[in-house]
């Protein structure tokens, strides 16, 4: 038997938070390798434990089956846009402060906040 190279994890997560009192937009692209690039192009390395938790949630079939919850923005609220690209699926989700999200989406948003702090 010939050893095979490990399969690269090509999971990419794009996360944008916009609105709030100041009306600001912040965005990040997070790679499973740990590379995090913010909207200004500044690159950092994610904490490995926080990244592992995020990637596990993002690749969960329940997360990949989500659709955006019904809801709309409100004054001074944040809008959250998340796109997940995996080798087998592409998902885009939008939600807002004050919307009742499925538990999988809440877990994803919490993990994203941890990685992008």
Spans of model-derived segments:
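Short, well-ordered, aromatic-rich surface patches in folded extracellular/luminal domains
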Residues: 1-20, 42-45, 49-52, 56-57, ...
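Short, solvent-exposed loop/hinge segments that bridge or flank secondary-structure elements
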Residues: 19-31
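Acidic/histidine-rich, surface-exposed loop or edge segments in extracytoplasmic proteins
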Residues: 28-42, 89-91
């Amino acid at each position: 038997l010939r050893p095979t190279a490990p399969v690269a994890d090509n999971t990419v997560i794009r996360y944008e938070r916009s609105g709030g009192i100041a009306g600001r937009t912040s965005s990040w692209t997070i790679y499973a390798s740990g590379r995090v690039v913010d909207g200004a192009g500044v690159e950092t390395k994610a904490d490995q434990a926080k990244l592992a938790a995020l990637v596990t949630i993002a690749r969960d079939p329940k997360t990949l089956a989500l659709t955006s919850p019904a809801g709309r923005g409100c004054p001074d609220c944040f809008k959250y846009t998340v796109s997940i690209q995996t080798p087998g699926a592409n998902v885009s989700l939008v939600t807002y402060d004050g919307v009742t999200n499925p538990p999988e989406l809440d877990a994803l948003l919490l993990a994203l906040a941890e990685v992008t702090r």
